Amino acid sequence: RYDLRLCAQALKKLKDAGYKLIVVTNQAGVARGYYTEDDVKNLHQYMNQVLQKDGAWIDAFYYCPHHPVHGIGIYKKECNCRKPGTGMFEMAEKDFPVDKAASYMIGDKLLDTEAGQRFGVASILVGTGYGAELHKEAQEKDEKPPYDHYADTLEEAAQWILEKKWKIKTK
């Protein structure tokens, strides 16, 4: 099982380095009727409460409640907000100044990394969740994977980002 305290510590390091932390998440469970948008918002609020115990927090959450095939009612639709679309990134960009050259998308699915690349930010696939298997499959193919870097954990991804930032500052 993944240690969420390590996750909070990694996020805190990024916050301490001046990064804004933005979550963009597909929530097809809303479209499928498994849970409500209020449930998603409550979960995000709870996540921040847990993270704040370790000095970290998420600056903003953006979610897509739609699904093009399995949705119910207003939630069954094609949209640009669902990753790999860039709609949630564009919403975040309206709320926060984004320096794309110094921004990163971290995710455990190729939809995440593809969305980041489409938006013009570097993408990191992490090995937690689905990432390790996807990375293994990508290595077996003789083509460039749809991500810029692979890290086994969020801690490794954060360290890579911080090292890259340090290198840029010292040039």
Which role fits each region the language model picked out?
Residues 37-41, 45-60, 68-105, 109-171:
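Asp-based, Mg2+/Mn2+-dependent phosphohydrolase catalytic module
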